[in-house]
């Protein structure tokens, strides 16, 4: 059977680093207040010359180089983002142009913080269906552009950045020892829309709008929803939490990460945490954390990696893959 195997990985972050103490002159908050509630200490904020497309392109180039490929080897460019450069065309098409790719196809996916999980799942389906041999999967965001900088409950949480994977078709044996995507489960429930959303859009207010969130409500639902899709992936494969080498969760809030790992009985030492240095980068969160753990030598070939995320909608999902 065909598996979607990770061939390369890359990431990109804006030059500017904004520490918690930098907020003290903007809103009523403190480093202690932010760290205690979120685990975040700093985040990267895009400058005027940095966009979702420029960050996504940089991460894509790094992933392609890491894979030992050329941009022209890519069949599909799939971008997960909620902060595109334009309403249309898709920012994936702009990244495709920047990379010099003129064949194949490209499109955006919007599932907010779950976007990268949705994108990997979609890429896997295209690969296993024979429509693409190599897919560039990107998560890129400039959430700083949709924040209300007077709302201390949200503006301290988010950062900007991008991460990318090259997924490639490879022959597998149909076993959980195969490299590549082993299972993926996605969910959504629009009844929770008002708990996490942006209060603008071209068809309603003709504005970009700002992010609005009921933090306590999100936290209340997060752990149960996340563990539900993970357990579905375990059931599908016959694997268990004990088999996991690395748990790479969406980096939204350290309390949610800790609670999810505890409920799943995943040891603290197996959890990849980058929320302290990146904040919540939405669809870029998981690939940035992955890239960090690969670069520092934690994630190695053959490791079983569990990815998960939850975002506005609500949307949520999990992917099991062997590196």
Curated annotation (Swiss-Prot):
Superkingdom, taxonomy of origin: Bacteria
Keyword Nucleotide-binding set for record: no
Disulfide bonds listed in the record: none
Residue positions of the active site: 113, 250, 280
Any one GO MF annotation of this record: beta-ketoacyl-acyl-carrier-protein synthase III activity
EC number: 2.3.1.180
A Pfam family hit: ACP_syn_III
GO cellular component: cytoplasm
Family, per entry: Belongs to the thiolase-like superfamily. FabH family.
Domain notes: The last Arg residue of the ACP-binding site is essential for the weak association between ACP/AcpP and FabH.
Quaternary structure, from the entry: Homodimer.
Function: Catalyzes the condensation reaction of fatty acid synthesis by the addition to an acyl acceptor of two carbons from malonyl-ACP. Catalyzes the first condensation reaction which initiates fatty acid synthesis and may therefore play a role in governing the total rate of fatty acid production. Possesses both acetoacetyl-ACP synthase and acetyl transacylase activities. Its substrate specificity determines the biosynthesis of branched-chain and/or straight-chain of fatty acids.
Protein name: Beta-ketoacyl-[acyl-carrier-protein] synthase III
Organism: Brucella anthropi (strain ATCC 49188 / DSM 6882 / CCUG 24695 / JCM 21032 / LMG 3331 / NBRC 15819 / NCTC 12168 / Alc 37) (Ochrobactrum anthropi)
